Each structure stands twice: as C-alpha cells, then as structure tokens.
Amino acid sequence: MSVINCEEVKRDEFHTEKYYESYNIFGAHIVTEDEMRGVRFTVWAPHAKAMSVVGDFNEWDYEQHKMLQVTEEGIWSLFIPHIEEREIYKYAIETMAGDVIFKADPYAVYAEVRPNTASVVFDIKGYEWNDKNWSRKKKKKSVYKEAMTVYELHFGSWKKKEDGTLYSYREMAEELIPYVVEHQFTHIEIMPLVEHPYDRSWGYQGTGYYAATSRFGTPHDLMHFVDECHKYGIGVILDWVPGHFCKDAHGLYLFDGTPTYEYKDKDVQENPVWGTVNFDLGKREVRNFLISNALFWMRYFHIDGFRVDAVANMLYWNKEGQEQSNEHAVSFLRELNEAVFAEDEDFLMTAEDSTAWPLVTAPTYEGGLGFNYKWNMGWMNDVLKYMECAPEYRKYIHDKMTFSLLYAYSENFILPLSHDEVVHGKKSLLNKMPGDYWDKFAQLRLLYGYFFTHPGKKLLFMGGEFGQFDEWKDLEDLDWNLHDFEMHRYMHDYFKELIALYKRSKPLWQLDHSREGFQWIDANNNEQSIFSFIRQGDKQEDALVVVCNFTKATYENYKVGVPDFEYYNEVLNSDAEQYGGSGQVNKKRLKTFQEPYHNQTAHVEITIPPFGVSILRPVKTRKGSKKQDGSKTKVRSNVTSRGKR
C-alpha cells in the first residue's frame, strides 16, 4: 500500500465522501521526497490555529517544525527530512484560545510503553505473512454451519512470568497457542489491544486506535502472533470499541481544543457510565477514521473478526432523561458492516448488544444492521440466574431455561460465558454454583453440558475451562496452581472431552440457526427441574438426545421420549467418576421401547444422574420402522430460519 501525498488528495475524499484508506494519508510515514529520506506527518485538526511536530529531534520545541494547513477543513502536513524509525513525537497544537496542547497522533501505528504517551515512528509494512493456507481453508467453510468455540482472554492476565512481568506477543505465541490447540478452541477473542493508558480499563478506553499496544511488543510482533495462530488453525477475533474513547489529555479528547472526534452537544457527548466521551458518528471524518481503522486491522494484522463492544450504548443515547435511538450510530454500523464484508465476506462481525433492537444480524439490504453474529446476553443472564438459585427453588423459575428458545432463531447468536460475569464481585462461574464443594463442580459440569448442547456458537472466558475458583483479577494471572487439586483436574478433563464431543458431533452446530436443529422432548418438567431435547444435523441419523437434571436427585428407569432408532448409547455423562462425579451412568446400550412418549414414537429408560447431563446418540435406524401416519421416522421440526447473508 502506497502512502498518498495529502496535497494531491481532493478534500472531498476525506471530508465529505467514504474514504476507507485514511491511514495512508494521516499519521507518520517514512518516505523519500526530493531525494531526501524522512517522515511525512499529516493530521486532521479543523479548529487549530497552528500546528507543529515536536520530539527529541527538535528538543520538543514547537517553534521549529511548523506544519502547513493543506485544506480549509483542517488537514495539516509537514515533511521532516532525516528522521528515522523509532523516533518519538507528538503534535503541538495552538488552539483558538491561544493555548498550546500536546497530543499523540490519532493515526500512529506504534506508541511508547505506558506511562509514557508519545507516538513512535514505525514502518508498519514489511512483515512477511505465511498464512495463505489458512485463508484458503477459511473460504471453504461457512461461518454459520461450522463448529465455533471461542476462548476469550485478557492478554495481560492469562499468564505472567515468575517475576510478574508480562509475556510479549511472541512469547504468548509459544505459551498460549499450544494450550488453545489442546483444548480444540476454534478461535481466540482478545480483549482490546489498541493502545490505552490505563491497565485497568482492560483496553476498552483507548487513545491509539491504529497502534497495537506496546505493552507486549511491536506491531510486527503481534503480526507474528496472529500468523502463528493461523498456522495452527486458530482464528483471531479482537474486541473493538467504535462507540466511545477515553478523556486522557494526550488522546483524542478535545483534540484541537474543541470537540473534534466527539459530539459537541454535552448531552450526548459524555458517557457517565464509563467516564468517556462518545464518537460523533454523524461526522464524515470520524466515520472514515473508524471504518479505515477496522480495515487497517484486517489488512495489516489479518484479523478474522471483531467483537464490537457496547453496541447498545451506540444504538441508544440518553438525552435529557429520554432514551432515544441514535440514527448516526445506526447508519454508521450499517456502513461499517458493508465495508467490512466487501473486504472479506467470511469475516466475523459480532455485536455485543443487550437490547431487543431487531435484525441486528440481518444484512443491510434486508433492513438489518449487517452483523453476522450477536452475543446472546439474554440467554447468559437467564441461565446464570437460574444456576445461582438454590436447586429446590429452581422449579419456580423454570422458564428462565426455556425462554431463550422462543427467540433463538431471531438472530445468529453466540452464547457468551464472558469476562463481564466473573468480575466486580459477581464471583467465578464455579463459585456462583450453590451448595457444597462437590455440588459446585457437579453443577458447573452440568452448566457446560447445557451450554454446549444449546443452539448457538460458544464463547468461554479464560479460566472457566478448569474451574477458576476466584473471580477474575485483572492485575494477576489465572490460578494455574489449581491443577494441583483433583477436582479441578477432573473439571479440566471433562471440559476437554465435552468440547471434543461438540466438535465431532454435527447435530450440535450444523443447524444452529435453523429451527430444524432443535426440538424439545420435555420442556415442562418444572417439578423435577429436568429438561430433555433433541439436537439434529443435516442427516436424519445425525441426532443427539440431551437430558439435563438441575437437582441433586437421582432417577432410575426414567422414561425419555426419543426418535425411533433401535438403540441408543450414552456418549457423555457429566456424573462419570473420571470427571469427579458419583458414577450414575448408563454403561449399557439402551434399547428403545415401541411406545410413544413425550410426543415421540418411542422411548428409552435411563438413569438420570444428580446435577447431571446425559447425552445419547442413536446406534442405527430400526429397519422398516414407520410412524403411525405411515411415513418414515425422523426428528420432528418446525420452519427453517430465514436466509443468511
């Protein structure tokens, strides 16, 4: 990609039109002009009175390197010869009020390690990628009809060195990737890696949207990390925050002394929940900044997806106490998704949205926002409330476990067990479970069994796979020493077996977004808090029967209606002794009885374990078996879901 000389750019391309390569104009680019090597600095500051570039090269004297205003709308530029890579710099901006403020470059691709705040000249080009095979394989797969297991993590607290320092991008490639491969996750989702000044913001309050945070190394080091992920078949999703940004003095806030990237109207500018300000998504220059940024990460870092943070905060703003939709945000999100999918039709665009806004994952040409996935926050909240309830009272909130199936096909959903639910006093997943030590582990195994068999793709926050006992502590690493304890090892073994079963079982993911893929057997047994259902794949014989018991009672010879296959085998039981359970399993092949039950044509009798999930797979179809209407037996279903992009 060539650097565009900003003096040759028509002002309409950035100020009034869709221009998604703004990173080629703005920022600090190493170039040769008039046979001299140096750096071209370009910045947008529409209300600046004067601009200059400062750094060690001029002893931070803002009188030396004055910038030239090249458009009336406020593009400033300057070529400085003999400046080399790794030079640190800022922009000195004289405001209309006569003050001089110092700002980091909004388009810088590298920055000093915090607490320092200067931008760093860096040649982003030149990394040699080795992921062509990954790209070819990705194009052969459907993001809708494949297994998807996402491992969400915070880069700085997954694991630390013995002295407490952080692993670099390259070191994390050596530490993290084998772990992810062992657990058969298909993707990792990393909490924001844009440059940010405050560790405890977890990256959600950024100052440098184009700069991969220098806490862990250089941009090329991060490229190496992504390249290695692709080498081992792992997709990389980044958390991305296009709705709001932090108010640190060196960042985007009041960039030229006036609201530049944020709204002017204080009622909609301020975001009091997080102490941030909202991007002015109605301003063309801001849209070009953000959409160019998304494409920059795709093109330069080969990212496979974004989890777009706080979409609810973007869709609605609270002005004078009235909740109103933000039409700027609605049109921005549609424009963003159109640009992203024009670049890569196999990209993952996931909305973190807790609202009931319709058609979030419908294409824009159908009136949707254009995402292809949405976090199912309702499912997460309902299920965790149910699990936190004492088992004997769960029968009174039975609908929390069934309600999600009323809307499961209204969007393309990912089921998140995310970082938000294991922090700020909410307890870890394991510690949310009521009861004694054994009960907690049994119920977490049960939760995971329900999680992996419920329609929707899967996301789990780090530590959940082995039963992290304490809630997430962002300044520490995970409690890896828990592997010294037997029950945590059992939990870890169970999780790995469960995710392996999920990946090799087409019924659990092939029809995630179609009503054909799920059927209740019994959704109404609130007295015993038992749920049973069928997951179905494309083929009739691709079916699994799932029975979940959310109390500590054990049931012998429990009748479960099933599709009419001759035999069933239990392929997983969360109560097996090798997982730390009591051993109430169904070891023998289960013969079906030709008596209708639960609105099915046959039934089996099984042992249902305490706080357990039992997954049954048919062995073979009964030869010549017929339903009462004379048709061949198949799993009953309703209408298919609407078409996808």
Swiss-Prot record:
Molecular function terms from GO: 1,4-alpha-glucan branching enzyme activity; cation binding; hydrolase activity, hydrolyzing O-glycosyl compounds
GO cellular component terms given for this protein: cytosol
EC number: 2.4.1.18
Active site: 309, 352
Chain intervals with Polar residues compositional bias: 636-645
Coiled-coil boundaries: none
Disulfide bond annotation, renumbered to this chain: none
GO biological process, one term: glycogen biosynthetic process
Domain of life: Bacteria
Enzyme class: transferase
Catalyzed chemical reaction(s): Transfers a segment of a (1->4)-alpha-D-glucan chain to a primary hydroxy group in a similar glucan chain
Keywords: Carbohydrate metabolism, Glycogen biosynthesis, Glycogen metabolism, Glycosyltransferase, Transferase
Assembly, per entry: Monomer.
Functional summary from the UniProt entry: Catalyzes the formation of the alpha-1,6-glucosidic linkages in glycogen by scission of a 1,4-alpha-linked oligosaccharide from growing alpha-1,4-glucan chains and the subsequent attachment of the oligosaccharide to the alpha-1,6 position.
Family: Belongs to the glycosyl hydrolase 13 family. GlgB subfamily.
Protein name as catalogued: 1,4-alpha-glucan branching enzyme GlgB
Organism field: Bacillus anthracis
